[in-house]
Every structure is written in C-alpha cells, then in structure tokens.
C-alpha cells in the first residue's frame, strides 16, 4: 500500500480540456479573422467579399506603396508611437516612484485610485469628455485660461497642438496600467541594495540610476513592448476626438485603413492592416530581443 | 579612523515599545566591538542607527568628535557589510567595489589601485570581471568586504556577515576578518548572534537582551565575571549551569533540599532562607577526587556526550541538572553515581528575580 506519497498527477490530457474552450475562441475570433484579412489583402476590392474573390497578387500593396497619404500616415504613426511610448514609460515610472515614496503618506490610496480609475473607464466615455475639455468655445480648459487672461490652447483644433492633446488624453487613460506593472516591480526590488548604495554614498538620483533602474528591467520590457503595440494600433482616440484631423495630422495607419474599408476599398484596407500587423510583430520582436539580451549577466 | 560613542541611545517605533532602550557605550578608536544577543535583542537596530539607516529616537551617536544623529548615511563616512551581501547584481566585481569611489569622483588610477589592493588582500583578483551571480557565497562575502575596505572609511559595520556561510567557511572567514582588522587597524562594529564569533573576534563585547545593554566588557571579563544571569547563560557553550538554591545560615542548599553543599568555613552573614541562583561553568564542575576546600556532592549521570577532545556529562542532582565538562578519557556511563566538586571561588551568585549578580 503506498503511504506518504502524493496522489498521482492527472494525465496531461486533462489540461488540454481546460485550455480548449479559450483556445477555440482565440482561433475563431482572433486567428481566423487575421488569416481572412491577409487573404483579402491579395484580392481585388470589388470582389473581396464574394465567394470567388479575384486574386490580384501584390497589387494592393503596390497601390499602398505609391500612396502618399499612406506614407504620411505611417510616418505619423511611428512618430506618435515613439513619443507616446517614451512619455508613457516616463510618466508611469515617475508615478510608480511617487506611489512608493514615503512623503505621500496617507494620500497613497487616493493616488492609487486616481491613476487606475481611468483604466477601467470605457475609452469612448473618457475621450468624449476630453473632446469637451479641449473644445474651443465652451471647453473647461480654455474657459479657465480665458478667466486667467492667458492665451487660449489650440487643443485638438490646431495642427500644432493636436498630437500632444491626443497623447495627453491617451496617457490619462492608459498610464495606470503601466504604473501597476512598475509598482509591482518596485515592490520586488532588493532593499539591501538600496541600503548598500546609501552606505556607498549614492544620492537619490544615483540610487535610482545605478540601483533601481537595473532592477526594473522586467517591467520596462513588458511595459515598452505592450505600449509599442498599443500605440501603433491607436484608433479609438482618433475616431472619437479628431476623425484624423485637423488637416490629416492625426490620420494614423489604423484610422486610414478604417476609412478605406468604409469606402469599400477592402483590398487596400486589409493590405494596410497586414503591413501594420507585420510592423508590430517586427518591432515587438526587436524590443524583446534587445532587452532580453541586455538582461543577461 | 574614529571612536564611536553611544549616549543613552533608544529606538522606538510607537513611543511605547522600545527596540533599543538607553544604550550607552563607547568603542575606542581602532577596536573591534561585537554586539551580541539573541534574535530581536536590538543589536541590528543599534548598528543600523549608527549606519544612518534608522533614525535615532532618543540619545546621541557620535563618530569621532562629531554628533551624527542628523547626518544622512552617505555623509557619515562609514562602510557596511550586509548579511546577504547586497551586491549590485548587474555590476561586475570590479564595479561593485569601485562604486563608492566613483560616486566620490575618485581619479580612475586611484580607483584601480585601491580595488587592486583590496582584491589582493582578499584574494579575489581573478574574479574582478565576474558578475556576483557567478560567485560562490564565500566569494560574494569577500567582495562585500572588499567594497567596504576600498572606501577607507572611519568605521566598518558588519551585520551578521557570516551567517549565510557554511560552518567551515564561517570559521575561515572569521579568522580572516580578525587578521584584516589587525592589518587595517580601523574601528569595527560587528553584530552577531553567535557567541563563539563574538568571543573570538572582539576586543570588547556588548551583550544585548530585549533592547537593553546587559554588559559591555572584554571577552575574558564577560566570561569570568558575567554581570547578570542573562550574560552568564548566553556566553559560553555549553552555558553556565544555573541552579536555584537557598542560602541558610549554615549552608547553601539546592535541589529542593535533596542535596546540600556545605561550604567549609563559609560563615553566614545573611538572614535565614535567602533564595538565590548559583552559577558555575561546566569546566569548573570536577568529577573525581575533590580538593580539600571544594564543595562536594553526589550525583547520578543522566547523559554522556563525547565531543572528542572532551566529554560533556550531564549530572542529575536532586531535581536539578548540572553539566560538567570532563576529560575525554574519563569513563562514565548513564546511571552511574559519582562524587563531584566545585571550588567556592568558581561559584557565581545571582538574585533570582532581577538576575543581577549578588
């Protein structure tokens, strides 16, 4: 009689049954549409949605290649993504450090709720409010500036401020998520190293740079890759607040693809989506590769 | 190099519970002082207050002639070796040791020289390019010590530096730290819960218990003249035998009257029936022929523990036990009845309530 032995592990097959429903959902609603979209990108728009779609090879991609609007949209998307990823990481890291610092005392709960509440607020509701805040004639921001006798803020109406304005709205909405990741990582940082650095004579900045930051690499990796993916796909904020304007300044790739799709140019739209998809895959892989390698001892 | 002075230093987190209570002592320049005591006695807290990693609730700490209460850790010119080493895992051994010097903008040539010297001293020269993850526990400990000595600080603090090492390595490193101290001559404050480490390393030992300083003295005096029951029980392995006894005009009785020590010529200046605790070191309990002026008694052997060089014999005397450190060539077995003796000058008497020496 077996005594003191743990019960035998259930056969591996059982786990497949647990995974199966979710795997099926992912395959049906995630992978399959992607396959279809890629397939559509090689067909003529006019017949794209018909059972016997006409194959056109790389023709849709050739159209994109020579489309100046697409080139601009791509450039804009990359610029915006770069700026937004950087701002998000910096803002989230600073906020996480604030949450950890001793001098916010009992305000900690308030600061935690304040940063995470927007994350669980529906995107569209948040962006509608931001659109109203930025409104030129009756928005809160300009009303306040006006009352103080300061020059008005262009917000989403001016080509020079719209990228910044959209980014602030997106930051407000998403930064809490990144803060949580950083905060969790900060909680795991080795206190001993921090004390050793104090004894070694490090000031606050030196401590952050030489001791904390190297320990935050896991969170930096997760956050920057995730932010990269999210900002390359930027869509909702544009659809709700600017419709790609003013003067195309927020016409990012995914919004442009959506517009083309709306116009029935399915082939080009899906070709564009495929390009974006490949780009996201490539950049994420690069970021992972670069950061994972730099973490090795 | 500097002396360290503690004047009525206390640490409390809520104003009522004291982690450290009114500790006063001074560590003279160049000495190696050990803070020893059981877990939670406040020894590490005290060290961290000296380091500047904990605030001082009451009292003053001075390093050299300067009161450092309000000085942040980085301005105290102290180096510390931590129990878990606290090396920077992403920096090489070289950079771990150089970090403090780099922060002080020491010239590169000077950094290389000092790190090189320390590495030679600690025999870690070949490891300078490695990362801490590629080192053994003992090597990491050396790097941590190296990081402290390259700074040439006024005072070194060691917080249980050997407790993560295995027994053999611990003994080796202990000797090495002692040699290092003799060579550098810098003031060292060393915290440990291991009384053997304390005895072997210290020029002075501070015994702490429940946040209070029990005794601060040289190892020899601490061992020979413990100031109270706690110190008597903590220092020495096996610890001093402590026996509940009653002093009567004619004798000292213990074992609930089952046994009686009759001191020859011990007159009794005390009133009748004074309870006290008698202490005697195991090496002072003699088995065999007793000297003329010794106190003698009968006991049963309860346990025999041969250690090789010597044998520990636990004697049952009435309801109390007495450990005797006997020669290893003595042959006794459990259940034997034998005569033992103690010389009166080896007896320590303590108050049973306060534990203070009589």
Outline where the language-model segments fall:
Chain B
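Conserved ABC transporter NBD signature motif
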Residues: 59-67
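ABC ATPase nucleotide-binding domains
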Residues: 73-230
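ATPase nucleotide-binding modules
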Residues: 227-277, 283-302, 311, 315-332, ...
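Conserved coupling/switch loops of ABC nucleotide-binding domains, chiefly the family-specific signature
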Residues: 57-60, 210, 347
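The feature captures the beta-strand-to-loop junction immediately N-terminal to the Walker
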Residues: 36-38
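Helix-to-loop junction immediately C-terminal to a conserved catalytic motif
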Residues: 51
């Amino acid at each position: 009689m077996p005594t003191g032995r743990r019960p035998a592990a259930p056969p591996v097959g059982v786990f497949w049954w647990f995974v199966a429903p979710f795997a099926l959902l992912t395959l049906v609603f995630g992978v399959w549409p992607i396959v279809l979209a890629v397939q559509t990108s090689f067909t003529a728009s006019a017949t794209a949605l018909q059972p016997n779609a006409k194959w056109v090879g790389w023709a849709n991609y050739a159209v994109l290649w020579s489309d100046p609007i697409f080139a601009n949209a791509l450039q804009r998307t990359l610029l915006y993504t770069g700026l937004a990823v950087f701002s998000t990481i910096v803002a989230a890291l600073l906020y996480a450090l604030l949450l950890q610092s001793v001098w916010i005392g009992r305000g900690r709960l308030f600061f935690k709720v304040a940063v995470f509440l927007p994350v669980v607020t529906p995107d569209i509701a948040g962006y509608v409010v931001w659109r109203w805040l930025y409104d030129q004639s009756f928005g809160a921001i300009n009303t306040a500036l006006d009352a103080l006798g300061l020059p008005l803020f262009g917000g989403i109406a001016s080509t020079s401020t719209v990228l910044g304005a959209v980014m602030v709205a997106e930051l407000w909405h998403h930064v809490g998520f990144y803060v949580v990741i950083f905060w969790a990582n900060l909680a795991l940082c080795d206190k001993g190293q921090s004390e050793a650095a104090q004894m070694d004579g490090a000031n606050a900045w030196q401590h952050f740079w030489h001791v904390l930051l190297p320990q935050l690499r896991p969170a930096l990796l997760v956050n920057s890759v995730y932010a990269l993916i999210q900002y390359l796909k930027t869509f909702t904020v544009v659809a709700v607040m600017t419709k790609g304007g003013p003067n195309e300044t927020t016409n990012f790739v995914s919004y442009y693809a959506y517009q083309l799709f709306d116009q029935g140019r399915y082939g080009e739209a899906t070709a564009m989506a495929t390009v974006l998809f490949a780009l996201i895959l490539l950049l994420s892989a690069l970021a992972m590769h670069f950061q994972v390698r730099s973490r090795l001892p | 190099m500097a002396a360290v002075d503690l004047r009525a230093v206390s640490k409390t987190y809520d104003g009522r519970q004291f982690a450290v209570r009114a500790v006063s002592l001074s560590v003279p320049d160049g000495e190696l002082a050990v803070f020893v005591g059981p877990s939670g006695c406040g020894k590490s807290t005290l060290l961290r207050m000296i380091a500047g990693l904990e605030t001082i609730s009451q009292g003053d700490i001075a390093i050299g002639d300067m009161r450092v209460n309000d000085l942040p850790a980085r301005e105290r010119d102290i180096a510390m070796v931590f129990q878990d080493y606290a090396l920077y895992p992403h920096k090489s051994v070289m950079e771990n040791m150089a970090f403090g010097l780099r922060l002080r903008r020491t010239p590169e040539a000077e950094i290389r020289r000092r790190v090189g010297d320390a590495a030679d001293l600690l025999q870690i020269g070949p490891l300078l390019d490695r990362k801490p993850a590629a080192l053994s526990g003992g090597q990491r400990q050396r790097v941590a010590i190296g990081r402290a000595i390259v700074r040439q600080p006024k005072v070194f603090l060691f917080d249980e530096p050997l407790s993560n090492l295995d027994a053999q390595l611990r003994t080796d490193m202990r000797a090495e730290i002692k040699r290092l101290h003799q060579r550098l001559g810098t003031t060292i404050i060393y915290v440990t819960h291991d009384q053997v480490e304390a005895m072997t390393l210290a020029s002075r030992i501070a015994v702490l218990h429940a946040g209070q300083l029990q005794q601060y003295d040289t190892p020899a005096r601490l061992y020979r003249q413990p100031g109270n029951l706690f110190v008597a029980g903590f220092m020495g392995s096996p610890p001093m035998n402590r026996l509940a006894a009653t002093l009567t005009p004619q004798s000292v009785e213990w074992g609930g009257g089952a046994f009686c020590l009759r001191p020859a010529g011990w007159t009794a200046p005390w009133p009748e029936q004074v309870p006290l605790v008698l202490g005697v070191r195991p090496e002072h309990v003699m088995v065999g022929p007793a000297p003329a002026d010794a106190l003698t008694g009968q006991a049963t052997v309860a346990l025999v523990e041969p250690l090789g060089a010597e044998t520990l014999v636990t004697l049952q005397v009435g309801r109390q036990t007495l450990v005797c450190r006997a020669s290893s060539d003595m042959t006794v077995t459990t259940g034997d009845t034998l005569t033992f003796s103690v010389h009166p000058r080896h007896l320590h008497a303590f108050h049973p309530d306060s534990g203070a020496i009589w």
